[in-house]
Amino acid sequence: MRKWMTSLLLTLLALPASAEQQKTIKDIEVHYSAFNSTFLTPKVASSYQLTRNGYTAILNISVLDRASLGKPATEAKLTGHAKNLIGNLRELSFKQVKEGNAIYYLAEVPISNEEMLTFDIDVDAGLKGAGKLTFSQKFYTEQ
């Protein structure tokens, strides 16, 4: 189960490879992806206590230590919000998931059909790096 979830999360991180959904901040690399929660199987969503429906997106962030051999995952503090085009804010609450050497931060975000959200996230990995991650993405609901 854990290997399957790790594979799924790595796949989701790799999906937008052409878009390079990552940001370098000092000695850390922040990788991110956002997707409709229906991409998760019911079993995986349940095991991580994630809501699985067509009106919830999952934000997945991993932070890697660029200064260490092999760029291992590193812990970070993440805070932030998502804002839609009319300025409504949705605070993000991140759950840390550790699987072997991997560390993921997951947040759930309610979405509406064809809604454009701008994410503003503060990433703090201590002396390794701290800064802001900002990106926008359009979401589509599933019935």
What function would you assign to each model-found segment?
Residues W4-L13:
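Sec-dependent N-terminal signal peptides
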Residues L13-A19:
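Sec/Tat signal peptide C-region and signal peptidase I cleavage site
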Residues Q21-I58, Y140:
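Beta-strand-rich domain onsets/edges
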Residues T56, E75, E114-T118:
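Extracellular Ig-like/FN3 beta-sandwich strand-entry sites
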Residues L59-A102:
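Mid-chain, structured segments of secreted extracytoplasmic proteins
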Residues K95-D120:
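Short, solvent-exposed, Trp/other aromatic-anchored flexible loops in extracytoplasmic proteins
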Residues V97, S136-Q143:
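Short beta-strand edge segments in extracellular beta-sheet folds
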Residues A125-L133:
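Short acidic/polar inter-strand loop motif in beta-rich domains
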